[in-house]
Amino acid sequence: MANKLVLISLLCVVLVAKITQAAPQYAPGDEPSYDEDTDDSDKLVENDTSITDEDYAAIEASLSETFNTAADPGRRLGEGSKP
């Protein structure tokens, strides 16, 4: 039992040592370097202002329409009804 405990503790120490060595090392006062950002600002598109008041009215009207009225796709027509 003691051998297992010693072995498990040794493995934990090795795991902690591996993790700490894998972390980047910086001297005091050093700042980490990051990848350079690419300048993709030329690909940005302004907001679309081509939507008119009529378009907004059509959208508002469609919100009051009924929806989700399709038949249940899990059932076949005629199934489940008692003769």
Curated annotation (Swiss-Prot):
Keyword vocabulary terms for this entry: Blood coagulation cascade inhibiting toxin, Glycoprotein, Hemostasis impairing toxin, Platelet aggregation inhibiting toxin, Secreted, Signal, Toxin
Report the outcome of R76 to A/N/E.
Reduces thrombin binding. No significant effects on anticoagulant activity
Query: Sorted alphabetically, which InterPro entries does this protein's record hold?
Result: Thrombin_inhibitor_anophelin (IPR018932)
User: In its keyword annotation, does this UniProt entry include Acetylation?
Assistant: no
Start-end of Basic and acidic residues biased regions: 73-83
Q: Where in the cell is it found?
A: Secreted
A GO CC term attached to the entry: extracellular region
Resulting phenotype, R75 to H/Q: Reduces anticoagulant activity and thrombin binding
Region feature Sufficient for host thrombin inhibition, mapped onto this chain? 54-83
Q: Which domain of life is it from?
A: Eukaryota
Give the glycosylated residues: N47
* Tissue-specific expression: Salivary gland (at protein level).
Protein name stated in the entry: Salivary thrombin inhibitor anophelin
Q: What is the lineage of its organism?
A: Eukaryota, Metazoa, Ecdysozoa, Arthropoda, Hexapoda
